[in-house]
Amino acid sequence: MTTEPTPRAATAPDDRPVPTPEDLLEPLALVVRGHHDDLTAVAARHGLSTSQARALIALNEPMPMSALAAHLVCDASNATGLVGRMETRGLVRRTPAPGDRRSKVASRTPEGTELAHTIRAEMRAVHAALEALTAEERTALLPLLNKLGQQLYA
């Protein structure tokens, strides 16, 4: 009678088990939730929804409305409403797209740029968590996060 060998978990060079994708999902979800909660609280202090804050931060360069909608993972009418509410507050402006006057490009006003920087600076929970990492850990983490993002949205 032949018995099948019991499969062994893969191990890293230092003999620790290599985490499976499932092992990584919960800690990753916790980080994402922390970022979302932090952004939501800071946005509310400035009278913005989380989606408006995300849009304001994303507009570090002028962006076609369709690209902003894709970035926010929403439909064009939702992005138009978000931008319209921020435009009313003087945070964003819409201008005709070069070469296609039917399309619009959204960009931040100076007030919008200042608020976007303020929101980022006030996201203390995220900053504190990242500052707790060593320089080497942050240096190692950045390319891994970029690779994950590229895999998800390539």
What are these model-derived regions, one by one?
Residues 150-154:
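Generic C-terminal helix-cap and adjacent flexible tail
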Residues 32, 57-61, 146:
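Short, locally clustered residues in the helix-turn-helix/winged-helix DNA-binding domain
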Residues 1-46, 110, 132, 147:
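N-terminal leader segment of winged-helix/HTH proteins
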Residues 27, 34, 38, 54-57, ...:
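Pre-recognition alpha-helix immediately N-terminal to the DNA-recognition helix
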Residues 84-146:
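Charged, amphipathic alpha-helical coiled-coil/dimerization segments
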Residues 37-78:
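N-terminal helix-turn-helix DNA-binding core of bacterial DNA-binding proteins
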Residues 56, 68, 83-89:
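Basic amphipathic alpha-helical segments that dock to polyanions
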Residues 57, 81, 143:
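DNA-binding alpha-helical recognition surfaces that contact promoter or target DNA
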